[in-house]
C-alpha cells in the first residue's frame, strides 16, 4: 500500500510538472512579442485619471476591468510621434492627456505603453472599460494600415481576450455610436462627443474575419 501511494504521489508530481511546462509553452506561443515603452506615470497622472473618471463616469477608479478593445489609427507616420503625444500627463490645460495602451507600428511591432488595465483616455464613453490599440497610419484620413499591422492586431486582441475573458467587444473608433448597443457607453458630460473615422472599415473587416470565431462581438464595418 505504501508503495502504491508513493507511486501515485510520483505520478501526480510528474503530471503537475509536465502540465506546468505545457502551460508555460502555450502561454509563450500565445503571447505576441511586444516592447514595453512606458509613458510617464506618476501620482499626478493617477490623480488626473481619478478626476476624469469621476467627472465622466461617476467612478472613483484608475484601473479597469476590460470589456472591450477599441482600435484606432494615429493619423501620423511614426510610432514615436504617437508615443510622445501620449507621454506627458496633461494636455497643457491641466486636464488628463490622451493615451492608449498599445501602439502598433507599420511593420507590426507592438509597443506597450501602460498597464493593460490602466484607465487611459482614448475613446469617449468607453475609457472606463476599454483597452486601446493605436495603429501608426491614417494620415489625412487615408486607409493605409498594413497587413503586418492587421496580423499584429489579431495576435494582440487574441492574447488580450485569452488573458481577460471579460472582453466581449471589438470595434473601431469610428464605430463608437453603434457600439452603444453593447450597453458599455457611459458619459456624464452633455455634448461631449467627437466624430471619428479610424481605423476604417477595411481594417475592421480584416479583424472580424480573423477573430469572429473567437467568441468576440463585432459591428457592421460600414460608416
Language-model regions, residue ranges each:
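Bacterial N-terminal signal peptides that target proteins for export
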Residues: 2-11
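Basic/polar, cationic surfaces and motifs that engage anionic cell-wall
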Residues: 29-45, 139-223
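Flexible, solvent-exposed short loops/turns enriched in glycine
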Residues: 124-129
Amino acid at each position: 500500500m505504501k508503495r502504491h501511494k508513493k507511486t501515485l504521489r510520483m505520478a501526480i508530481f510528474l503530471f503537475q510538472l509536465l502540465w506546468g511546462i505545457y502551460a508555460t509553452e502555450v502561454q509563450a506561443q500565445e503571447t505576441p512579442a511586444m516592447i514595453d515603452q512606458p509613458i510617464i506615470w506618476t501620482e499626478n497622472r493617477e490623480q488626473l485619471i481619478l478626476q476624469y473618471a469621476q467627472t465622466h463616469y461617476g467612478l472613483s477608479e484608475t484601473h479597469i476591468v476590460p470589456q472591450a478593445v477599441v482600435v484606432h489609427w494615429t493619423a501620423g507616420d511614426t510610432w514615436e510621434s504617437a508615443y510622445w503625444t501620449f507621454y506627458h500627463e496633461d494636455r497643457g490645460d491641466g486636464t488628463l492627456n490622451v493615451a492608449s495602451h498599445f501602439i502598433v507600428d507599420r511593420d507590426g511591432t507592438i509597443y506597450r505603453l501602460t498597464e493593460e488595465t490602466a484607465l487611459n483616455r482614448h475613446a469617449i464613453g468607453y475609457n472606463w472599460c476599454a483597452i486601446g490599440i493605436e495603429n501608426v497610419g491614417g494620415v489625412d484620413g487615408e486607409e493605409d494600415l498594413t497587413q503586418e499591422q492587421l496580423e499584429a492586431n489579431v495576435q494582440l486582441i487574441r492574447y488580450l481576450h485569452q488573458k481577460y475573458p471579460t472582453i466581449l467587444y471589438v470595434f473601431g473608433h469610428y464605430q463608437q455610436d453603434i457600439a452603444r448597443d453593447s450597453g458599455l457607453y457611459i458619459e456624464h458630460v452633455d455634448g461631449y462627443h467627437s466624430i471619428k473615422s479610424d481605423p476604417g472599415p477595411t481594417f475592421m473587416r480584416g479583424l472580424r474575419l480573423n477573430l469572429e470565431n473567437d467568441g468576440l462581438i463585432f459591428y457592421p464595418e460600414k460608416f
